[in-house]
Structures are given as C-alpha cells and as structure tokens.
C-alpha cells in the first residue's frame, strides 16, 4: 500500500517591474539526478524537525539568495505519486514577493533563471501543479483578492 508524505514545499517567487508582475523560473542543472534541465519554481524538501514555513524560507534563500518582502500560503496543495517510492506526495505551496533590485544568486542546483509573465512562466513549467500554482498566485495574491489578505504570513 502506498504511503502518504508531506515533505516538499514550493515557492512561487514574483516581483514587479513597471507595475507588471514577473515570476521567477529556475532551470535545473544538467548534473541534477532528478529532472535535469527542467524549468521549475523554487522547490525543496522539508528537513527533519523543520516546519513547512521554515523549509520554504530556507529553500528560497538557498536557491535564489532571496528573503521575501512579503509571504503567503497559497490555497492549494499539489499532489503527485512517486512510483519509485510508492508514495503519494502532498506539496505545500507558498508565494513570495521579493525586491527586484536584488540580483538572483543561483545555487549549484540550477544553472539558469528568468523573469517571466505568468503565461510565459506557465509555458516553461513541466508539471501541471506548478502551472496551477502560478495561476492561483497571479489571480488571488498578485491580483489582490481577499484570499491574499487572509493568507499573508508575517515574516
């Protein structure tokens, strides 16, 4: 019987350029054993003893060098099945607004990045769950709907 796990986080990172929202996409290194050369939002594992929020802040810093100006919990949990581990994974998703004046500092896990409109970012995504996360962040959080004020996290 498959196990159920919740040990992965994702962070949709955005900033504003001339009042237009742009989303950060990262391209995994060619040497990464899992999904090399694919584009993704910030993604990482929750370490033992760490909360999902702590993992999101750590992964954001490790993968991009950023600390968020604002942070939200996204009203979506991605779910996927790993055949290799016989596990149903639930992924907690966050959104982070960053200061666009600060340059990206990529970790060795990625070799390329770009800032894209929501449609361009979704075109780069491999996984449907990340496309859906970008849609929700764009509509509800960046769009300033009530869900944004209800899901903002003080950092």
Labelled PLM ranges:
Residues 13-15, 25-27, 93-97, 115-117:
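Short, well-ordered beta-strand micro-motif
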Residues 40, 88, 115:
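Short aromatic/basic micro-patch
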Residues 93, 105-137:
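NUDIX/MutT-family hydrolases
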């Amino acid at each position: 019987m498959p196990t159920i796990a919740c040990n992965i986080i994702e962070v949709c990172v955005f900033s504003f350029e001339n009042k237009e929202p742009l989303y950060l996409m990262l391209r995994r290194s060619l040497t990464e054993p899992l999904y090399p050369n694919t584009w993704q939002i910030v993604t990482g594992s929750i370490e033992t003893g760490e909360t999902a929020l702590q993992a999101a802040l750590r992964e954001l810093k490790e993968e991009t060098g950023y600390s968020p100006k604002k942070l939200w919990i996204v009203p979506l949990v991605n779910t996927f099945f790993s055949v290799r581990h016989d596990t149903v994974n639930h992924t907690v998703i966050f959104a982070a607004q960053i200061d666009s004046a600060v340059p990206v500092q990529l970790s060795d896990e990625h070799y390329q990045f770009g800032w894209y409109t929501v449609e361009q970012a979704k075109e780069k995504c491999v996984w449907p769950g990340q496309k859906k996360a970008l849609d929700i962040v764009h509509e509800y959080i960046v769009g300033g709907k009530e869900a944004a004020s209800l899901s903002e996290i003080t950092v």
